[in-house]
Amino acid sequence: MEPTASGIFCNRMLSMVNSEDVNAIIQAQRHMLDRFEKTNEMLINFNGLSNVRLQQMNEHFLMHTRTLIEMKKDLDSIFRRIRALKGKVAKQYPEAFSNVSESSNLEDDDDEFDPIPASVATITTTATSEQSTESCDTSPDVISPTISCCSEDPSQEHTDTPTSDSHEQPVLRDEGPDSADI
């Protein structure tokens, strides 16, 4: 039989393709497929670990957020108590409290030069059972920087706390987040 044109064309096309090259290409594709499968498996493991870690961090974040919210509520409560105590002191000793308010306004003008006036730094006050029986106030708006707030009995005061025999009134300032300037 005489070869047909299509048969000749097919034979020449087949003879142009080198079987070694085809086998090398197939081998390279199998190698790449193995690498892609391993990479895919590693990425799946990484995603799983990342999701677990994200859940852990989310729980920690929520816990810390709740802690911050509770701390803010506690601080708001503390500042409310301080304002109530200031109001009580203002009602019990209106003359002294008005003098303190006037002197604090004058001292606010001098704060540029002396951040803590010497008269305020040497005043010592002790907390009484009328003021608080719950806990010590360690907030930044303490009446005086030298106050021993945990001491309810004067005999239990710290000996390193400076005292003064002067009859000056302590400066009461409310620096809480909800306070208005006096």
UniProtKB/Swiss-Prot annotation:
It is found in: Lysosome membrane. Its main location: membrane. Residues 124-135 have a biased composition (Low complexity). Pfam families: KxDL. One of its GO terms (cellular component) is BORC complex. Keywords: Lysosome, Membrane. The keyword Membrane applies. InterPro entries: KXD1-like, KxDL_dom. Residues 155-176 have a biased composition (Basic and acidic residues). Residues 124-182 are annotated as: Disordered. GO terms for biological process: lysosome localization; vesicle-mediated transport. As part of a BORC-like complex may play a role in lysosomes movement and localization at the cell periphery. Associated with the cytosolic face of lysosomes, this complex may couple lysosomes to microtubule plus-end-directed kinesin motor. May also be involved in the biogenesis of lysosome-related organelles such as melanosomes. Belongs to the KXD1 family. Associates with the BLOC-1 complex. This is KxDL motif-containing protein 1. It comes from Danio rerio (Zebrafish). The gene is kxd1.
